[in-house]
Amino acid sequence: MASWDFIVIGGGIAGVSAAAELARSGRVLLLEREERLAYHTTGRSAAFFTMNYGNAMIRGLTAASGPFLTKPPDGFAEAPLMSPHPAVTVARHDQDTAFETNLAKATASSGNIVEISPGEAEAMIGVMAPGYVARAHLEPDAMAMDVDLIHSGFRRQLTARGGEITCRAEVQSLRRKNGLWQVATGTQTFQAPVVVNAAGAWADEVAGLAGARPLGLQPKRRTVILFAPPEGVDLRRCPLVIDCEELFYFKPEAGIVLGSPADETDSPPCDAQPEEFDIARVVERIEAATTLQIRRLAHKWAGLRSFVADRTPVVGHDPEIKGFVWLAGQGGYGIMTSPAMSRAAATLATGNAWPLDIAAHGIHAEDLSPARPSLA
């Protein structure tokens, strides 16, 4: 039976980044149930780096991740991980209260977010329906993220530090014996004193195999469409446009347009597929807000974003099951928080001191703990 210091379950951004960090401290094996890494949520993300997204914990983790994503270590990637892409939040006349709430949270998170006039927003976007925008604010330093580069960079770190990856390795049993977890995949069994549960939408199911209590993790489906703009309409310089109540967003994507109804439909863990109702909803909302007419879709897909009750990620040792570390509930924020989250997970798994830069953003181990009162 092959032995390791750490076994990480799940090959999305959470598992790969945590495994790369853990490989600084010991021998790491990453297990992925699918044929390739990042098949589910990570590989379907419309990732964007913004300080105006998520609750206070998410915003702190995002801020702590910014320096890494802006200037990664030498050799991490062959190109920049992010590129400038401003974001404009818009509101109709009947959304004034929601806009005020959004603006207050936004300006508390970033001093660079400012309110702009409807005319300025319309000029920046270029395709808003006349009279639609009553208020707007601008995040000038938001960024587009290259998900593939970020994920492959962590994978490269993992293997360079001696870590190994095994795909088509769905965990079927977890048994602790003589201080070691025996992790059986059906064809092989591996052992390690510490297991990190980064199984995404399946994290509660993996926990059940270990005898741990579930977190009450709820996967939620998010739908995305791609469509071509009308002939003669150039949206390459268009910002990310998002409704102040997250009823829709759209942005340019490699010469076409990516849009979403920002849906959060409860789902079991699965290979998520888009529903026609959600596709119709995003088409209707974007057409109502803009001069765009969506005649044909270039592509459509869906992914799962998994949350616990307080919508804050869960990182740390299970309070009852020795050697079982949670790394789950990232919601839709896993990529932009991955540098900070991976260091938090590795710190807690190894018992090292909490990172000072993460603490400086108001995030402490107890805030992410699976034993925190808000999960009771």
Question: Where do the protein language model's features map onto the residues?
Answer:
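Beta1/beta-strand and adjacent pyrophosphate-binding region of the FAD-binding site
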Residues: 1-14, 29
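C-terminal lid/capping helical subdomain adjacent to the catalytic/cofactor pocket in oxidative enzymes
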Residues: 2, 320-376
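Short hydrophobic core segments
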Residues: 7-9, 190-202, 342
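Active-site substrate-recognition segment that forms the wall
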Residues: 17-22, 49, 71, 77-86, ...
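Glycine-rich FAD pyrophosphate-binding loop
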Residues: 23-42
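Dinucleotide-binding Rossmann-like beta1-alpha1 core, especially the glycine-rich loop
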Residues: 46-124, 247-249, 285
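Helix-loop-beta segment of a Rossmann-like dinucleotide-binding subdomain
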Residues: 78-89, 103, 109, 114-161, ...
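Helical element adjacent to the flavin cofactor pocket in flavoenzyme catalytic cores
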Residues: 137-193
